């Protein structure tokens, strides 16, 4: 914030600096999005947003008719958890709360069984906490495709964490008949959306919940799918602690997504 105040121009403004929770921030963002000019192109840097805030932002853009034409920018990570060895990677620890994301409540009917869908990332503990909280009748775990990953190193780490999570689930012996897996793109949100949609087409009559835990680009894809299919709920697991000293180092390229 100090950098912003030092370098800001007269028309620049800081939104949400006094907010103490996500609902207050969403209200402030809604006022800003509502005022976006239709004569100017909106460019949003999503790099440092939480998965929850990113999904809310997309919901607001859609609600106020500003989604089409908006450009999302994302600086991919060169390395995650750069203050640890590759075998000790951690991005967050613990889960404070699990909640549905504002704008994506879904349609949850008591008469239907629950289907939890997790595009898996590096945070196995968060995924385990979500599975334990929801106790779904059906569980789908997504793994990023090698050819649709940011880098081979990211794919290898992600694949290792995917196997850890699947091994945990297998050991519980709760989903022997109802566990399924799918692959998805980590670099193209439209592909991600279609990958998840194709997988979900195999199921019907369920309360579907998606918990995006991979990179922000795939979260965009999940949110876009849920805008098309509003019966799907999006959930977010809020960590107790982030690896603030070594979460990620910036890569040397920026992904631009034209919505």
What are these regions (language model features)?
Residues 1-42, 49-259:
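Long, low-complexity, Lys/Arg-enriched
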């Amino acid at each position: 914030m100090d950098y912003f105040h030092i370098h800001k121009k007269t028309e620049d403004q800081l939104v949400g600096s006094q907010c103490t929770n996500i609902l207050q921030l969403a209200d402030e963002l809604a006022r800003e999005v509502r005022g976006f000019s239709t004569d100017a192109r909106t460019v949003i840097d999503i790099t440092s947003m939480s998965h929850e805030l990113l999904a809310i932002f997309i919901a607001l853009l859609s609600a106020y008719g500003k989604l089409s034409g908006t450009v999302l920018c994302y600086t991919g990570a060169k390395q995650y958890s750069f203050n640890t060895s590759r075998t000790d990677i951690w991005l967050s620890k613990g889960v404070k709360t699990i909640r549905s994301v504002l704008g994506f409540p879904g349609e949850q009917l008591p008469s239907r069984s629950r289907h939890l869908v997790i595009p898996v990332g590096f945070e196995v503990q968060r995924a385990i906490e979500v599975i334990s909280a929801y106790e779904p009748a059906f569980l789908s775990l997504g793994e990023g495709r090698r050819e649709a990953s940011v880098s081979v190193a990211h794919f290898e780490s992600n694949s290792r964490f995917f196997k850890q999570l699947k091994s945990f689930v297998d050991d519980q012996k709760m989903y022997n008949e109802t566990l399924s897996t799918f692959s998805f793109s980590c670099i193209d949100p439209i592909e991600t959306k279609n990958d998840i949609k194709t997988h979900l087409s195999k199921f019907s009559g369920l309360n579907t919940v998606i918990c995006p835990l991979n990179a922000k680009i795939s979260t965009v894809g999940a949110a876009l799918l849920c805008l098309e299919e509003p019966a799907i709920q999006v959930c977010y697991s809020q960590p107790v602690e982030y690896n603030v000293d070594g979460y990620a180092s910036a890569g040397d390229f920026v992904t631009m997504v034209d919505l």
